[in-house]
């Protein structure tokens, strides 16, 4: 959801609470739980999962390896669930032409730097930059070039914008901020 008026432009950024992250976290959790159960059932010599007979899987080396993969998968799955729970990467971009201030806010991981808040003056913005890399894995990223700060990404790398969409977004933002567009 975005909100724009003549003087203020607010763009909400979706973080890690995306459908694909939920999907992969569920798949990884269920798969690693299955591996751990098969490894445990081969150790105990009993069937914990009725789909696989545990007598066919020896504990050494297959059961140990499956248990290791199950534990590793549970750790990775818990990491994914934590990023979803904390909504890492979400936030907003606020461009206020009336005050001449740009505010960029993102949620990070818990700790001292959980809230990432950048604030700078509009007159420090040099340009809006589009970086395009074509090929097998095309990448189109929109940056804001800031004097003394470098380039600040405004779109996510995994956001698959078409060339038309990224040009449209860059043109609208450059027009709103009254800065030039650079293409790399």
From Swiss-Prot:
Seems to be required for the assembly of the photosystem I complex. One of its GO terms (biological process) is photosynthesis. It is a multi-pass membrane protein. The chain crosses the membrane at residues 22-42, 57-77. Belongs to the Ycf4 family. The gene is ycf4. One of its GO terms (cellular component) is photosystem I. Disulfide bonds: none annotated. PANTHER family: PHOTOSYSTEM I ASSEMBLY PROTEIN YCF4, PTHR33288. Keywords: Chloroplast, Membrane, Photosynthesis, Plastid, Thylakoid, Transmembrane, Transmembrane helix. It is found in: Plastid, Chloroplast thylakoid membrane. InterPro entries: PSI_Ycf4_assembly. Its main location: plastid. This is Photosystem I assembly protein Ycf4.
């Amino acid at each position: 959801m975005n909100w724009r008026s003549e003087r203020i432009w607010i763009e909400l950024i979706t973080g890690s609470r995306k459908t694909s992250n939920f999907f992969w976290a569920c798949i990884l959790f269920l798969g690693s739980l299955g591996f751990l159960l098969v490894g445990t059932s081969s150790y105990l010599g009993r069937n914990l999962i009725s789909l696989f007979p545990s007598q066919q899987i020896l504990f050494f080396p297959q059961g140990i390896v499956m248990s290791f993969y199950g534990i590793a998968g549970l750790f990775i799955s818990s990491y994914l669930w934590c990023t979803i729970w904390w909504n890492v990467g979400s936030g907003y971009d606020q461009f206020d032409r009336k005050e001449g201030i740009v505010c960029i806010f993102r949620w990070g991981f818990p700790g001292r730097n959980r809230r990432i808040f950048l604030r700078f003056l509009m007159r420090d913005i040099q340009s809006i930059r589009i970086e395009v890399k074509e090929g097998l894995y095309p990448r189109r990223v929109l940056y804001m070039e800031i004097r003394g700060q470098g380039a600040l990404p405004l779109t996510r790398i995994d956001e698959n914008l078409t060339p038309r969409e990224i040009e449209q977004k860059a043109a609208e933002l450059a027009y709103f901020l009254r800065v030039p567009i650079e293409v790399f």
